[in-house]
């Protein structure tokens, strides 16, 4: 195998942001290309989702960076950040009272490490959202806001996707990493990647492309097929 790896975010990158909660995995064309690519190069998913969520949808990846870098799984090993703030669990009932979709992200060791408060269905953020976020920050939790995405993330650690990329790059024995992402939480990963790709869609037109290679999400299958052809030919 080559010493180059392809790492990608899940929500809004491999799966359109409107379909993340209901989709059983990436679109068929994307999934097929990734399955073939994983036979030639190392492929990893670096996501804000929990590992059990993404592993069930992309079981063929060589590595996973989950819950925004809090949990790493690769090569038969699993590592979870040691600095998890248990105040997140204490606030979980408060989050659920906001009357919007709340996604809890649990580590494989059974600790609540992340929460997404998502108002995509309602169109407007909850009235008490800012008060709740202020309380979370006062307790030392990491609140991650997005420019135009209709959700906010709260984490029990300040680990990030850049940490996940560095660790997975080392565990998988890679010299170079191509990283595909779409939002603010991908910036730390882009910073440490060798090739930085921004997947464009309706929620992220505000993100500047300086230093990034933009690809529209509808063009992703064709891009992956192009990469697949290149690595397949080079391996012959």
Label each residue range with its predicted role.
Residues 2-20, 190:
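Asp-based phosphoryl-transfer active-site loop
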Residues 14-22, 149-154:
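Glycine-rich phosphate-binding "P-loop"
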Residues 17-19, 24-109:
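Active-site phosphate-binding/coordination module
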Residues 43, 64, 177, 196-198:
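Short, well-ordered beta-strand core segments
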Residues 48-51, 184-185, 200-205:
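Short, polar loop motifs at secondary-structure junctions
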Residues 54-59, 188-192, 203-211:
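Short loop/helix-cap segments at secondary-structure boundaries that form the rim of catalytic
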Residues 101-193, 207:
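Conserved acidic, metal-coordinating active-site core of Asp-based
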Residues 196-236:
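Asp-based, Mg2+/Mn2+-dependent phosphohydrolase catalytic module
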